[in-house]
Regions:
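Glycine-rich FAD pyrophosphate-binding loop
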Residues: 266-284
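Central helical "cap/lid" subdomain
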Residues: 280, 418-464, 493, 510, ...
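N-terminal Rossmann-like FAD-binding beta1-loop-alpha1 element of flavoenzymes
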Residues: 245-271
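A conserved short coil-to-beta-strand element within the FAD-binding core of flavoproteins
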Residues: 394-409
Length: 873
């Protein structure tokens, strides 16, 4: 956004745009204390917490004087300041160099000063002092605020130089944010301002001005605030409530731990209750992750929310955690698809110099955004650090709560114990769906699997494209992550590892072991999954003599071959005999080769986008299939090419197998389709001697163009077939001396370059293990943050919203002292901090750290309200 142009005249900052100085040249600190901060003397003994609204942050002297007053006190200050053209950090540093008496507080402000990007910026400068800087037009920002101010500082440039800031319209918006009796302080004695304040419900007095100024205005709010239009999202009025002293957090993930940290910092006695044997064992338990925002088009609310959450998270983690937990090395977001590129272009026009990220359109392999405060994060370590010293109850499964007389909450647990607390915060992440089953809230649990590999990508900072890659930590590099909505499978799957590798294929490099290869074509390479993979932490997958991986040590000879197939000379062998690729390509019957059936194409498209067909071939007989004891789960199959005339017999016999329904085969033809993926519960039974090979999802090559003398393929010399089944090199290539060849990715890695290089000698990636976790996702991609609403009241009071949404409605009703905070999805490290901060804002009746329009997007009742507005119940 546009920053202020500051010219220094005799050491005093001057604005050429408004032709005015930023503060009194004679005694700026004295003026600030006399005109503005003296208001605290009038109300100091009446309150323990003060909310201040300022129009015109300028050089920040009013705030710094207030900060200095509160810093070592037992009072709390929540200061909100609006600025349309903020001064840069460098210019502020020049200004503060002349105020040695403010050095202790100005240094803290400079350290936390945000990038100059439109929106709200919450700075927690001390346990009892928050500053919310709101960059934007004063009238627009006032509409986005939601709190009751005890004092208002009107300190813009002179009314004659900046009329819009002192208008009656602005005064009316200020009045709607004032508590009854709130004071308005200003150096101005303008007659127009006096009338504007009076017309807005203020009682106005003239007082002696400071220094050479004869008079100044002081006003008190004596009117009534207008109810907001969408009253169903209004905040709870805590008038008369006793300040809480204790809090119980349900959930030991990042959302719960950060919330516990912040509530303890406010002086509450905090307890965490976690159902598992330790904290951070679910979605917050990854070895490594990325702290970065979701970049959408600038005006999209989802992106605005994520930008706010990211900036808060970067400040919080930077202030409170160490290098062992998080390393601010920057992060890169690649525009691997057109819609991301379009977002970057729009940001370039809107606010390219935003201070959060730098756009680069000429880079390889894609255009990118480098996020300056992006970080390599250690989520589990972060949870441990944030919860250090906080009482934590493990193996403590929450079952429900009841409200007690006086507003306290009693939580009940599966083992029969109960815990009472003044505040209950539900931070259960992926289990929110079950917890809020009785509420009109659209939630789902998403299974995500990350893959741990030996270091393979040379990078000192994390990055994200279709997948993401973290720098190696402790000899382990994390890539990820899969996304399976409402799939509950704790065991890692090799097919997910393959997908993770395929999603970052264009970035893979290095010299790796020969046992496990990856398709570098840049396309999906989903493979057959045979039974459970087993616990990935026991990196003891059985290797076979042909380089494949046995996924289940209890299943002899049932194998998955990673990667994809090339020509028949280098196909992985069945009993030392190669598969006849020519017959596969031509659709002819190949001896002892059968085809397994398919999952619903539409579901695949929804989950993965458009993917190429996948072919599975295996050597077995229908009799063995029908009599087998070993399950086969088939997923990620889109279309298959029938390669054996005996498929009808196979399907017929397979239908007799225990646990498999022949009706799953809806037709037996050259293209056999299933209505849904098979899994372990309705799987085909395959014999012990069955061996499998996945052809991957690359492009099937015309065997007539294969160079049968070569040990590797050159795709540029091959004619593409119309059936679009792309087969790449699977088996090991060796040099003349018999040693395995290695592969180094070029510095200028593009999908095309990598494809060509990969078909010469694809690299080997050694998978160390995998980690499965579950995350919470809402139906609209916003997290659930806020006070738990009274479902019955909403359905009754707002049942006629279809007709009355523009008429007066009753104020909402909430469940006393129960809050929710979900660390949402892949940006959970960011939204966890946003959630914790908002919960504190609501508990302590502070100004919100985010725009009101964005807070409404997080409200737990939003899904119900949308239904009621449509006349639904």
């Amino acid at each position: 956004m546009k920053s202020a142009r500051v010219v220094f005249k005799g050491g005093i900052p001057f604005s050429p745009e408004f032709d005015d100085v930023y503060f009194n040249a004679d005694d700026p600190i004295g003026q600030s204390e006399y005109v503005f901060n003296s208001v605290f003397d009038e109300i100091w003994e009446k309150k323990s917490e003060f909310n201040v609204l300022e129009t015109g942050f300028g050089a920040g002297l009013n705030f710094l004087c207030a900060f200095k007053r509160f810093k070592n006190s037992d009072k709390f200050l929540n200061f909100v300041s609006i600025e349309k053209t903020p001064i840069t950090r460098d210019d502020l540093a020049k200004i503060y160099a002349n105020f040695s008496e403010l050095a202790d507080v100005s240094g803290e402000l400079l350290d936390a000063y945000p990038p100059l990007i439109r929106g709200f910026h919450r700075l927690n400068l001390a346990p009892n002092v928050t500053l919310t800087l709101c960059f934007g037009d004063v009238a627009e920002v006032l509409d986005e605020l939601s709190f009751s101010a005890d004092a208002v500082f009107m300190d813009g440039f002179a009314p004659a130089k900046n009329e819009a800031m002192w208008s009656e319209r602005v005064c009316g918006k200020i009045a709607n944010l004032c508590a009854f009796g709130a004071s308005v302080c200003t150096y101005s004695a303008s007659g127009a301002l006096k009338r504007a304040l009076q017309n807005s419900g203020f009682e106005v007095n003239l007082l002696k001005g400071y220094g050479k100024k004869r008079e100044m205005l002081r006003a008190k709010f004596a009117g009534e605030r207008q109810a907001r239009s969408e009253i169903w999202f209004s905040r709870f009025d805590p008038a008369g409530m006793t300040a809480p002293k204790s809090a119980l957090i349900i959930g030991g993930g990042v959302a719960g731990c950060v919330c516990a940290f912040k509530l303890r910092e406010r002086g509450l006695d905090v307890t965490i209750a976690e159902k598992r044997s330790d904290i951070a064992l679910n979605g917050s338990g990854n070895h490594c992750g990325i702290l970065m925002p979701l970049i959408t088009k600038p005006s999209v609310n989802l992106g605005r929310m994520h930008m706010n959450a990211f900036l808060q998270a970067a400040r919080f983690y930077g202030q409170n955690l160490g290098a062992q937990e998080i390393e601010f090395c920057g992060a890169t977001d690649y525009a691997y698809e057109q819609k991301t590129l379009e977002r970057f272009y729009e940001w370039r026009e809107f606010d390219a110099d935003n201070g959060v990220f730098e756009l680069k359109f000429e880079g390889e392999p894609y255009a990118s955004a480098f996020i300056f405060s992006g970080a390599k994060a250690r989520p589990r370590k972060m949870c441990k650090a944030a919860s250090a010293g906080i009482k934590t109850l493990l193996n403590c499964e929450f079952t429900g709560f009841e409200t007690l007389e006086g507003g306290a909450v009693r939580a009940h647990f599966k083992d029969g114990q109960s815990i009472d607390a003044d505040v209950l915060v539900l931070a259960v992440g992926s289990e929110s769906m079950e917890l809020f089953a009785d509420y009109d809230i659209r939630l789902s649990s998403v299974r995500g699997q990350v893959t741990h590999i030996e270091p393979a990508v040379r990078t000192s900072a994390p990055f994200s494209a279709k997948g993401y890659v973290c720098p190696p930590v402790g000899g382990v590099q994390v890539i990820g992550a899969t996304y399976d909505r409402n799939l509950f499978l704790d065991e890692p799957r090799s097919s997910d590892d393959e997908k993770n590798l395929a999603d970052v294929a264009e970035f893979l490099d290095g010299k790796f072991a020969k046992s496990e290869r990856v398709n570098l074509s840049g396309e999906q390479d989903q493979n057959l999954t045979i039974g459970p993979d087993g616990d990935a932490k026991n990196a003891d997958r059985l290797k076979t003599n042909n380089g494949s991986v046995n996924l289940n040590e209890n299943t002899d000879n049932v194998e998955i071959l990673r990667g994809a197939i090339a020509d028949e000379k280098i196909i992985s062998k069945f009993d030392d005999e190669p598969i006849d690729v020519a017959s596969l390509a031509n659709g002819e019957n190949s001896s002892e080769t059968k085809t397994v059936a398919t999952s619903d194409k539409n579901s695949l498209t929804r989950e993965f986008g458009e993917i190429s067909p996948v072919s599975f071939a295996y050597e077995t007989s229908a009799e063995k299939c029908a009599s087998s004891e070993h399950p086969l789960g088939v997923k990620f199959i889109n279309q298959i090419k029938t390669v054996n005339k005996n498929l009808p017999d196979l399907a017929k016999n397979a239908g007799k197998a225990d646990g498999f329904k022949s009706s799953n085969f809806t037709k037996i033809s050259p293209l056999a389709n299933l209505q849904r993926p098979m899994n372990a519960k309705d799987a085909v039974k395959i014999g012990k001697d069955a061996k499998f090979v996945s052809a991957g999802s690359a492009e099937f090559l015309d065997s007539s163009n294969l160079d049968k003398r070569a040990e590797s393929l050159n795709l540029t010399s091959l004619k593409r077939r119309t059936d679009r089944l792309n087969l790449l090199n699977l088996t090991e290539n060796k040099d003349a001396d018999g040693s395995a060849q290695t592969y180094d990715a070029p510095n200028s890695a593009t999908p095309e370059n990598l494809l060509n290089a990969a078909t010469k000698t694809p690299p080997n990636i050694r998978i160390i293990g995998s980690k499965v976790g579950y995350r919470s996702y809402s139906g609209d991609r916003f997290p659930l943050i806020g006070r738990l609403y009274d479902e019955d009241f909403y359905k009754d009071a707002y049942k006629s919203l279809l007709w009355t949404k523009n008429r007066p409605n009753p104020s909402p009703k909430y469940v006393p002292n129960v809050y929710a905070s979900t660390a949402h999805g892949s940006r959970g490290l960011c939204t966890a901090v946003l959630g914790a901060e908002l919960v504190c804002d609501l508990i302590f009746d502070r100004p919100l750290c985010i725009e009101k329009s964005l807070f409404d997007e997080l409200h737990l009742a939003r899904f119900l309200v949308r239904k009621l507005k449509k006349g639904l119940r």
